[in-house]
Regions:
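Structural recognition of the beta-strand scaffold that forms the well-ordered cores
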Residues: 30-32, 37-40, 49, 172-173, ...
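Glycine-rich phosphate/pyrophosphate-binding beta-alpha loops
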Residues: 39-47, 168-172, 184-196
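Internal maturation/activation junctions in enzymes
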Residues: 11, 60-186, 199-200
């Protein structure tokens, strides 16, 4: 059915592509956050952004700030901003580009980054104009390589892409019993190609970013 869809709609995926694809089973990433051990899939998935955020937050006494207090929310947002600045610059497939995962997830690195956070006001968003993913893809504001035991083979370079493209659709839903579902789909353009495979219900994307 997939091959038929591709042929009918001038798609790029062939039966040979499907036959040659192999799923890779890899060890998950993990960090210790206070009394918890938190796991996430390794790169090119972006879970290390969350793990880095937790590592940064661990350097602050968030419990004393109070749940969802202005002080707590400020520290969380600032930690996430720093982690996402790294994500926009370093996220990639380790099979094709060097990603300093050990450095990004080291406790020493997180402590270094935490010392750059101002407790009184936001700083990162005031330093540039435009979208953060465009800005930080070109500029590294931290150096996780200092916390790696190796040197980079090749650093990520910003490629050609549509500066105004939107590539991720997200929705959350809940029922009366408190069951929650959070879904994020990256299909490049808004809803990808806007074509759904007849009978399969697959929404085809319109690009191969990662």
């Amino acid at each position: 059915a997939i091959e038929e869809d591709m042929k009918k709609n001038n798609g790029l995926i062939t039966m040979e592509d499907l036959a040659n694809f192999r799923a890779e089973v890899k060890n998950p990433l993990s960090v210790k956050y206070r009394d918890f051990e938190v796991f996430g899939p390794t790169a090119p998935c972006g879970s290390w952004t969350t793990l880095e955020t937790l590592n940064i937050l661990e350097n602050f006494d968030t419990k004393s700030m109070g749940h969802n207090s202005p002080e707590y929310l400020h520290m969380f947002v600032e930690a996430a901003r720093h982690a996402f600045a790294d994500r926009y610059h370093y996220l990639g497939d380790p099979d094709f580009v060097d990603v300093p995962l050990s450095g990004l997830l080291s406790k020493e690195y997180a402590k270094d980054v935490s010392q750059q956070i101002n407790k009184n006001y936001a700083e990162l968003e005031n330093s540039y104009e435009g979208d953060p993913w465009n800005h930080y893809s070109d500029i590294e504001i931290h150096d996780p390589w200092k916390y790696e035991s190796r040197n980079p083979n090749a650093k990520l370079k910003n490629g050609d892409y549509d500066q105004n493209s939107d590539c991720t659709t997200h929705f959350s839903t809940a029922d009366k019993n408190g069951n929650l579902v959070s879904c994020t789909q990256t299909a490049v353009g808004h809803f990808g190609s806007k074509v759904v495979s007849k009978g399969l219900g697959i929404l085809w994307n319109n690009g191969m970013v990662w």
